[in-house]
Amino acid sequence: MVQGGIYQRPFLVSAGRTAVGGYAEGHAEYAKTDGVTEGLSMALRRFNIFLFSSVGRRIRFTSELEFENGTEEIALETALVDFVVNPSFVIRAGILLPPIGAFNVNHDGPRYDFVERPLVSTQIIPATLSEVGGGVHGRLAPRGLSLSYDAYLTNGLGEGILLNSLGRLDLASGKSEERFAEDNNGEPALSARVAAQRRDLGEIGFSFYRGTYNSFRTDGVVVDDKRAVSLLAVDLRADVGPVSLQGEAAAAAVEVPESL
């Protein structure tokens, strides 16, 4: 299932309850736009290191450190702890991946055969999106189905959605390093996903994300209206014999000042 994706990774070396792994993703590209090309280009897009440890019978820790485009961007993409009450109720806290669609959770390069990431996951859903927070997730298995749920409160996206160098609305610009230290408005964002899977058919999931993105008060004084960003997504994986078909659709709504 999509939910368990962060634990289904290429771990290469294990010792006791701890495992270390990772992957590197390099591309050679030749692009042409309107008959014009800049020739051949090569890049080391990502170099990722994973660390996992089962601390005890109920506690699991996992993390991911990513080097993107060489050392242009270095990010701690995941660093979370799971406390397993039972498989149907797991408490999670740390730097986590909000479950908006399937790709934001299962985005590792070795899983896919394509060079570029899906447009819906970069132009609408700002994958890869990591946020600090906590919540619960779990899995149930009634009558041959596997049902899963995730629900988290996180710091959320920031004012870069509207105030950015692109001069337009851009959800990816709402990501900033400051969001790992504090929430810019003190109102956590809510993200949630529910999904159903049948082993011989596939999986379908429905996701929701909503949070206030602007700083609407200063020193306790309200200085602006609250403005929120909302995302809805549906993801589908259909297994037809040896073929697996995957798709994802998303819609975003952003509240902006009346002057815009």
Task: State where each predicted segment sits.
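Outer membrane beta-barrel
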Residues: R9-E159, G186-S191, A195-E203
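Outer-membrane beta-barrel transmembrane domain signature
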Residues: R111-Y112, S121, G158-D183
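Short coil-to-helix leader/linker segments, especially the first N-terminal amphipathic alpha-helix
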Residues: M1-R9
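Loop-centered beta-sheet repeat module
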Residues: R168-R217
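Detector for outer-membrane/organellar transmembrane beta-barrel domains
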Residues: A15, A196-L260
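Active-site glycine- and acidic-residue-rich loops that bind
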Residues: A127, A181-A189, V222-L231
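A short secondary-structure junction signal
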Residues: L147-Y149, G160-L166, R217-T218
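Sequence/structural signature of outer-membrane beta-barrel proteins
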Residues: H27-D34, E66-G70, I100, G156-G160, ...
